[in-house]
């Protein structure tokens, strides 16, 4: 077979393979915009702790590795997840702890847990 054709087939094969990897790496769910307060889930779930008075504690807990969540006005709780490198979006959300933000992303519900894979935070 012609070397140029072989090279072209190789490039096409690699691109198809990468496309399949990307498709499987993206979470499956609906795109949503959710407004709520950024909280550390440990303190919020354990004692309902949130708000400006709890901000420094929440930052410390999140830096220690506790999960970060979003609580809406209706007390709906979402775990915050990142898409890139499976990171939980800490870089963006740590500085917004105890603030009200709008998160855009992909909502996934499974086993009683609802999580948003973050696309943007405003």
Model-derived regions, located:
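Bacterial N-terminal signal peptides
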Residues: 9-21
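Intrinsically disordered, low-complexity segments enriched in glycine/proline and serine/threonine
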Residues: 7-10, 33
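OB-fold and OB-like single-stranded nucleic-acid-recognition modules
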Residues: 23-122
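N-terminal secretory signal peptides that target proteins for export/translocation
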Residues: 1-7
């Amino acid at each position: 077979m012609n070397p140029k054709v072989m090279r072209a087939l190789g490039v096409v094969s690699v691109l198809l393979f990468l496309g399949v990897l990307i498709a499987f790496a993206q979470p499956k769910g609906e795109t949503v915009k959710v407004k709520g307060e950024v909280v550390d889930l440990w303190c919020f779930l354990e004692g309902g702790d949130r708000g400006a008075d709890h901000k420094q504690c929440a930052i410390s807990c999140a830096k220690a590795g506790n999960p970060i969540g979003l609580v809406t006005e209706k007390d709906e709780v979402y775990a915050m997840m990142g898409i890139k490198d499976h990171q939980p979006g800490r870089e963006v959300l740590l500085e917004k702890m105890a603030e009200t933000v709008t998160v855009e992303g992909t909502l996934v519900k499974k086993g009683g847990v609802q999580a948003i894979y973050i696309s943007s935070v405003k």
